[in-house]
């Protein structure tokens, strides 16, 4: 019996592939407004500080390929064909949907490489994909909305946190705090009833419980440079505040809203947060990001299959 063929649309933010892409990439993020020379110079400096253009593009591609491989390995009913769609650079989400349509894919499942739902992120990715599919007359698309509660995802982070705490001296362990963070979004999402902040808190609760950590908080990072208020506290301010109020001597940063090594982690955490801990004379720890770790890829595969089972697929 031949297997059913299904498109696997993996969506992510996207990143410049080379330095020449910086301007058009950030122009797209800024809805067509070109970044100033100062902004571009600042961005170049940040990328240089992390060793050149972020590794995100290669990691995202690897995550998507490994996910398709894993899905085809663990079940025999469906043959998944992977299509990668990015938010701010080619292949855009629409390009991927168009490619599926041209390849004769009639049904597809989408997943965004971001664990939490928000109107600004996951909703906009899935909205763009559905809109393009409707415009073309196919494929029929079912979308994963969030996956932060997946036990295997929580286990990935809990295992890394346990390893990190095990590497500390006893004194550090007793005086350590875990900061679980995600990308800040404009504060107005709270008034809109967006579940994003609550989902980050739940993620932190799950990870801390599984890792056996009692001292933990959530923080926000990488806020945009706009006049409107963004979700806080920012992780750098939070680090100073926790040090002053509680006297912690070791800070463990888990940027659980992200899934790979990229500018927001390699610069905003590993450089900016570390500058703060160095200034305070305390220890900085940041467990490895999921990237294409088999444990994380298996978590994503489980999310996709569980979603399809709920949609009535016989798997």
Swiss-Prot record:
Pathway: Porphyrin-containing compound metabolism; protoheme biosynthesis
Gene3D superfamilies in alphabetical order: 3.40.50.1400
EC numbers: 4.99.1.9
GO process terms (BP): heme biosynthetic process
Binding positions (Fe-coproporphyrin III): 13, 30, 46-47, 54, 125
Ranges annotated as spanning the membrane: none
Cell compartment(s), UniProt: Cytoplasm
Reaction(s) this enzyme catalyzes, per UniProt: Fe-coproporphyrin III + 2 H(+) = coproporphyrin III + Fe(2+)
GO cellular component: cytoplasm
Keywords: Cytoplasm, Heme biosynthesis, Iron, Lyase, Metal-binding, Porphyrin biosynthesis
Highest taxon, organism lineage: Bacteria
Family in the record: Belongs to the ferrochelatase family.
Function of the protein: Involved in coproporphyrin-dependent heme b biosynthesis. Catalyzes the insertion of ferrous iron into coproporphyrin III to form Fe-coproporphyrin III.
Protein name as catalogued: Coproporphyrin III ferrochelatase
Provenance organism: Anoxybacillus flavithermus (strain DSM 21510 / WK1)
């Amino acid at each position: 019996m031949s297997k059913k063929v299904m498109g696997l649309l993996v969506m992510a933010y996207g990143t410049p592939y080379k330095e020449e892409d910086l301007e058009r990439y950030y122009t797209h993020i800024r809805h067509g407004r070109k970044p100033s020379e100062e902004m571009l110079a600042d961005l170049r400096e940040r990328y240089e500080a992390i060793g050149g253009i972020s590794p995100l593009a290669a990691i995202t591609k690897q995550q998507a390929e490994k996910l398709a491989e894993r899905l085809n390995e663990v079940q025999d009913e469906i043959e998944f064909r992977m299509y990668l769609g990015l938010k701010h650079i080619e292949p855009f989400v629409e390009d991927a949907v168009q490619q599926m349509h041209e390849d004769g894919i009639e049904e597809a499942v989408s997943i965004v490489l971001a664990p939490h739902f928000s109107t600004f992120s996951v909703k906009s990715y899935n909205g763009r994909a559905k809109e393009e599919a409707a415009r073309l007359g196919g494929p029929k698309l079912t979308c994963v909305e969030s996956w932060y509660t997946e036990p295997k995802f929580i286990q990935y982070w809990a295992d890394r946190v346990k390893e990190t705490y095990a590497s500390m001296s006893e004194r550090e362990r007793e005086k350590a705090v875990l900061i679980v963070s995600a990308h800040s979004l404009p504060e107005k999402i709270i008034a809109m009833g967006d579940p994003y902040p609550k989902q980050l808190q739940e993620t932190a609760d799950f990870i801390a419980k599984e890792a056996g950590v009692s001292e933990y908080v959530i923080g926000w990072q990488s806020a945009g440079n706009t006049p409107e208020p963004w979700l806080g506290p920012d992780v750098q301010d939070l680090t100073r505040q926790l040090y002053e109020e509680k006297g912690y001597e070791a800070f463990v940063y888990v940027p659980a809203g992200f899934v790979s090594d990229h500018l927001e982690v390699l610069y905003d955490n590993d450089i900016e947060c570390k500058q703060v801990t160095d200034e305070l004379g305390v220890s900085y720890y940041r467990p490895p990001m999921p990237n294409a770790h088999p444990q994380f890829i298996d978590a994503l595969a489980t999310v996709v299959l569980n979603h399809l089972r709920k949609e009535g697929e016989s798997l």
